[in-house]
Amino acid sequence: MKIAIAGASGRMGRMLIEAVLNDADAQLVGALDRAGSPFLGQDAGAFLGKDTGIKLTDDLDAVFAQAEYLIDFTRPEGTMAHIAAALRHDVKLVIGTTGFTAEQKAELQAAAGKIGIVFAANMSVGVNVTLKLLEFAAKHFSHGYDIEIIEAHHRHKVDAPSGTALMMGEAVAGALGRSLDDCAVYGRHGVTGERDPSSIGFAAVRGGDIVGDHTVLFAGIGERIEITHKSSSRVSYAQGALRAVRFLSARGAGLFDMQDVLGLR
């Protein structure tokens, strides 16, 4: 599997490079970084004390010409440029970027008509199994329980609520036969009045080096149920991304997520 990594100098990019280098079935063939990055020209394995012979570059076409797959955990504007390059070079994509606009998501979906794409806000096995648990719980706590989603991430995260929190909200809302767009309440402030019993509330915490904590609270009278997932390392995301690459190796064009990859549908 000839794999290139986007955002190669970032925290997730470094973890992905390490995962690819340690996988006997994978070959690192490219490492992309943003234009103007101070790390351009540096060996992709320098962060690990290894010499890979692959230099960090901002030349999209040069990297895509060598790759069969690109793993992308960057930002929406970067990912959209990567999608365009992938279409030019017929490269399959594993995308963990969050914060897309509706228009950008539509472009991503259109691209999946020509190339294989796995798009998931969270690629850990644990989170995706948790989504199934939430669907089950929501169906049984549909009356008399208020639903709130609390997430916490490191100080550098730029979007809120997290993509994973939104995935959890969509799983719960879908199980209840609702649209998250219609029932979500984000970041209450001031005099808000009584809680709408059909709403799903979101709260976001940012600080320190928190990798990612998510709790869905079902609060009833006399009891509450909390379903929590906590990430202590980005290793689970990197391993999930490689699992997604393997999944795409046996697929043609189409848009998939980790529920497809893990056979949880």
UniProtKB/Swiss-Prot annotation:
Catalytic function, reaction form: (S)-2,3,4,5-tetrahydrodipicolinate + NAD(+) + H2O = (2S,4S)-4-hydroxy-2,3,4,5-tetrahydrodipicolinate + NADH + H(+); (S)-2,3,4,5-tetrahydrodipicolinate + NADP(+) + H2O = (2S,4S)-4-hydroxy-2,3,4,5-tetrahydrodipicolinate + NADPH + H(+)
Any one GO molecular function term: NAD binding
Any one of the GO CC terms: cytosol
UniProt pathway annotation: Amino-acid biosynthesis; L-lysine biosynthesis via DAP pathway; (S)-tetrahydrodipicolinate from L-aspartate: step 4/4
Entry keyword annotation includes Amino-acid biosynthesis: yes
The protein's role, per its UniProt record: Catalyzes the conversion of 4-hydroxy-tetrahydrodipicolinate (HTPA) to tetrahydrodipicolinate.
Annotated protein name in UniProt: 4-hydroxy-tetrahydrodipicolinate reductase
Species in which this protein is naturally found: Burkholderia cenocepacia (strain ATCC BAA-245 / DSM 16553 / LMG 16656 / NCTC 13227 / J2315 / CF5610) (Burkholderia cepacia (strain J2315))
